[in-house]
Amino acid sequence: MDLPALSRPRVVMGLLFFPRGGSAQVTRALAQALVEQGWQVTIVCSSLRLPSRLGDARTFFGDLDVRPVDCTAALQAADPLCADPPLPPSYEDRPGAPDRVLATVDNATYEHLVATWARVLREACADQADLLHLHHLTPLNAAAARVAPEVPVVGHLHGTELLLLETIEQGPPAHWVYAGAWAQRMRRWAAACQRLVVPSATQLTRAQALLGIDPARCVQLPNGFDPRRFERRSVDRMALWHRLLVERPLGWGPGREPGSVRYPPHVLGLFAQGPVLLYVGRFSAVKRLDLLISAYNRAREAFAVSAPLVLLGGFPGEWEGEHPLETIQRTGARDVFLAGWHDHDELPEIFAASDVVVLPSVREQFGLMLVEGMACGLPALAVKASGPGEIVTDGQTGWLVPPDDERALAAALVAVVNDAPERHRRGTAAAAAVHTHYSWPMLGARLACAYEALLGRPPVT
C-alpha cells in the first residue's frame, strides 16, 4: 500500500544547471527511482524556454515535482550571470559562451548566485525536507547552508567539478582570476556534506586527493540505465537514419543552427552495407572527437565493409577546441556524419540502429552512454582509463585502448568492423553484464538505503 504523502520522507534535489548533459539524466533517473522507493522528491533546477525546448526543465523532468528557475531572459543581458535570475556559470571554459567558467566569476557575482538560489530553496521549503541531495559542488551548497543548516546534505560528484579542480592545481589559465577562491569553496562544500555520492572507484580516489574527503563518508553509486527502455529491439534502420540525417537533420556547424548540416539520400547506402559506429555525447575537449575522427580516417581504408561513424550530440552552439565538422574538413575524413542533439527518449531506437558504441574520452567521469548502449546489445570501444575502464571488460564486453593513442584506436576500429562474430559475441556479453550491475531501479534502492542509514531510519515500506 502506498504511504500518504505526509508520512513519506522528502528529499529536495538541487541542480544548478539547466538540463542538457549526463548529470541531468542522472538526476531525473534517481528522482524517478526514489519515488518508486516511497520518497517524495522535489527538484530545483535552472531552465530555458527556447523554441527547440532544449534545456526546458518542465519538459525534461516530466511528471516529477520540479521547481524551474527560468534563465531565458538572462541570455539577453549584458552579463547573463548578473541577471535576475542569473544564468548559471559553467565548469567548462568555452570562449564567447554566455555561461562563462566558474573560475572567472568574481565575489559579487558569486554572492548574487547564492542569494538567488537561497530564495529558490526557501520557496521549495528546503528547510522542511528530510534531506538535501545537491548535484555537483556549486553555489547551491552555500545557499543550502544559509536556508537549511539543520538538514543533512548528500553531495553528488559527477566529475566535471574534479576536472576543474585538476586544471586549477596544474596551473589555471591567466584569465581564471578567481580560481583559488572557487577551489576553496568547493573543498569547503564537500567537507560540509554528510555523504558524497561518487560514481566510480577512480572518482573516489581523485576526490580524496582533490577535496581531502574521508572515504568513509562516500557512497559509491554508478550511473545506470532504465531496463524498461534500454534493451535489444528491432527497428527499421534505414528509415531511422533517413529521418535523422536526410529528412529531419539536426547536425550543426560552428555559428550555425541545428539542421544546417544535412546529407543527400544516396549516403544511406553506407548504412545498408556494414556496421554503424556510434558516438553519443557533447563536443567537449575531454571527449577527444578530433582523435576519433583522425583514427577513423586512418582505419577506414582497412575496413572490409563500409562502416559509417555517426556523432550524435553536441548541445547546439556548445563545443570546445576544434569543432568535429572542422576536424572532418581538416582531415578529409569521409563517411563521418553529424546527427545533432537528440532527446534522451530517442536513444533506445538509435542504439538499436547501430552496432558499436564508441567513446574515446581520456577523462570520462563515468560513461553513461556506454552503459545504455551496452544494455541494448552493443559492444563498447573505449579508453582504458577512468569510468569506462571500470565498465568495459576488454575482450569480453568490448575493446579498450590506451588514452590518446590514435594508432591503437584505429586498430581497434578495424577489429570491430571486420570481425562481425566477435562483435556480436561481445555485444551479447555487454548486455548481460550491465543488466546485472547498472539498472536504475536497483541503484535507486541502494541510494534510498544510504539515505535511510544517514537518517537512522528503517527502510520505507
Question: What are these model-derived regions, one by one?
Answer:
Residues 6, 42-127:
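A conserved catalytic-core segment of Leloir-type glycosyltransferases
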Residues 175-196:
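Membrane-proximal helix-turn-helix segments that form the acceptor-binding/catalytic region
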Residues 202, 224:
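Carbohydrate-associated surface elements
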Residues 313, 321-345:
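Nucleotide-activated donor-binding/catalytic signature segment of Leloir-type glycosyltransferases, i.e.
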Residues 341-342, 349-354:
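Short alpha-helical donor nucleotide-sugar binding micro-motif in glycosyltransferases
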Residues 362:
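Aromatic "clamp/platform" in nucleotide-sugar-dependent glycosyltransferases that forms part
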Residues 379-382:
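Short hydrophobic beta-strand element within catalytic cores of glycosyltransferases
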Residues 394-395, 399-406, 415-420:
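Conserved acidic donor-binding segment of nucleotide-sugar-dependent glycosyltransferases
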